[in-house]
Amino acid sequence: MSAPSDPAVATHPQAGAAAAASSSSGLTFKLHPLVIVNVSDHHTRVKAQAACSGDGASSAAAGGQPPRVFGCVIGVQRGRTVEIFNSFELVLDPVSGTLDRAFLEKKQELYKKVFPDFYVLGWYSTGSDVRDTDMQIHKALMDINESPVYLLLNPAINLSQKDLPVTIYESELHVIDGSPQLIFVRANYTIETVEAERISVDHVAHLKPSDGGSAATQLAAHLTGIHSAIKMLNSRVRVIHQYLVSMQKGDMPLDNSLLRQVSSLVRRLPAMESEKFQDDFLMEYNDTLLMTYLAMFTNCSSTMNELVEKFNATYERSTARRGGRGAFM
């Protein structure tokens, strides 16, 4: 998924925080979902804490606006490819707008011990637009990375927007009014995932409240996803079939190009009537029935063993009581 190519985000040019349409550096950015999850979680926690405290600690919270959060993004750069893997939070002085350098260096050192190949690539924040004060924070990180990136997450919910509310900016030196100034320019990015991230994100996306049942299990979520995919495939096939029937009856004009595409699509599907398919299908079907039968048989055996053990324990206690009473008499 690429970043949205919106118009330029304009800010005060004297602050050096104007955002041009697109970057000209030629770098390729790959963003991992863990970063988006971390930034979203950071914003949600700070917003919830501000709502619970109700003391109006920050001016943003006091004005009814969601508070901004700040942090660093880390990853690797291989040639012209920048891959952002993870992130961590930063402490910002709300009065002076400066970063806590001691906290930043400590966090950087700790992450270096766990991820020795990861470097600080830039920083992140939340909001709908680039602000004038963002360039001040951006310049403060240039002693760690001479060309840091700025990741901006918009926490506002926009149901009509299909793209991710995430924008990545680079800084470029432009001559404005005869003087060189740093400005933010948009950079395109793609979402890159590894197997562990795909499993985690899929689990979070299908997570349901635990009510003692099995609906929230991973198997149920997996089967639900397969069912939705098959249902969608079935609806698309029905649309194609209805269109072909209408074309055959003469209700729709003949489209040879579309017929070639349908023919190519049909050829990709496996031959469902072949003898080998029937043999393999019956073999897997019988194996599944056998596994189900063995599971039921094992469950019944376990239940029977528990019943026998309870019966023996009850019988032994009853025999002991009768034997003790006879010996006493």
Curated annotation (Swiss-Prot):
Cross-referenced CDD domains: MPN_CSN6 (cd08063)
Domain (MPN) ranges: 44-175
Any GO MF annotation of the entry: metallopeptidase activity
Induction: Down-regulated during the early stage of iron deficiency (at protein level).
Listed GO CC annotations: COP9 signalosome
Domain of life: Eukaryota
Subunit text: Component of the CSN complex, probably composed of CSN1, CSN2, CSN3, CSN4, CSN5, CSN6, CSN7 and CSN8.
Family, as annotated: Belongs to the peptidase M67A family. CSN6 subfamily.
Name of this chain's protein: COP9 signalosome complex subunit 6
Gene that encodes it: CSN6
